[in-house]
Amino acid sequence: MKNIAILSSGGDVSGMNPAIKHFVEYALHNGLTPYFVYNGFEGLIDNKITKASHSDVAGIINRGGTILGSSRSKRFMLKNYREVAKKNLDALDIDMLIVLGGDGSFRGMDIFYKEHGVKFCGIPSTIDNDINGTIYCLGVDTALNVIKDSIDNIRDTASSFSRAFVIETMGRDCGYLALVSSLCSGAELCLIPEVEYNLSSYEDSFKEQIKNGRKYFIVIVSEGIKDNSKEIAEWLEQKVGIESRVTVLGHTQRGGTPSIYDRLMAYKFVNHAIDALLGDINSSVVCYSKTGFIHKDIDEITSQKYMLDPELLSYLKKF
């Protein structure tokens, strides 16, 4: 019987636990012995590896985060620690790994594969949805729902007090969360890192809207824009003339009960990952495209920066 392990690396997302649950179920279904690696690549080095069973994943499908824990391992970037990790896997006869993470995690795992021949398949897992080669990453739908609920709640109080609210989403280099949540929440302004902006260009329009009876504004910004959220709020007060508040959603976006869509995508991602490893695709990332699931190698994933969908960007012109 072959042995296969799973770990989560980097930022956690809702959807990891459903993926972990199905990993155990589908591995056993295929005659494999499933193992958990705790605390990401750190767990490979520290030998925090245990055999998994159905009882270990009972009741986790509705939980956010990851029961395995996660980490950003600097030690795994060093060859001597990767050698320790290989010895720990060899002791348990594990030669296949599934990695829930981002492109940094996949690059580290690709080095490990080239050095030691441990086969792996990556499942894109980041709420930023910024991995090149896939149009969807695990956790994004749940994060968008968390953001949507927050904006809806903030709109209630904004309208009651005639205020503007600047709502900051995650997305240091990618404005996907801010843009999609703006479109789906009726925001009056959206600012993202990918698109240059000049706040003064909005002043006349905003003042005119207030003159015509608008009582509040919802402004959604990505954390990666050139101005911080406090500066946007100060602009609204000083130049537009409306009392303003800032809400930074922060790590709330990573939590929450996994949505139906993320549970379904977790199921599909895991199926394709295990099938790939059993089908002798030794080093790949499962990507979701407009035509379905495909496997891409790490060089293809990391060769260029993720770009927002041009159609989505075209909608930004409405703001």
Curated annotation (Swiss-Prot):
InterPro entries in the cross-refs: ATP_PFK, ATP_PFK_prok-type, PFKA_ATP_prok, Phosphofructokinase_CS, Phosphofructokinase_dom, PKF_sf
Keywords, ordered alphabetically: Allosteric enzyme, ATP-binding, Cytoplasm, Glycolysis, Kinase, Magnesium, Metal-binding, Nucleotide-binding, Transferase
Pfam families assigned to the protein according to its UniProt record, in alphabetical order: PFK
Binding site for Mg(2+): D103
Keyword ATP-binding found: yes
Pathway of action: Carbohydrate degradation; glycolysis; D-glyceraldehyde 3-phosphate and glycerone phosphate from D-glucose: step 3/4
UniProt EC number: 2.7.1.11
Subunit structure: Homotetramer.
HAMAP family assigned: Phosphofructokinase_I_B1
Protein name: ATP-dependent 6-phosphofructokinase
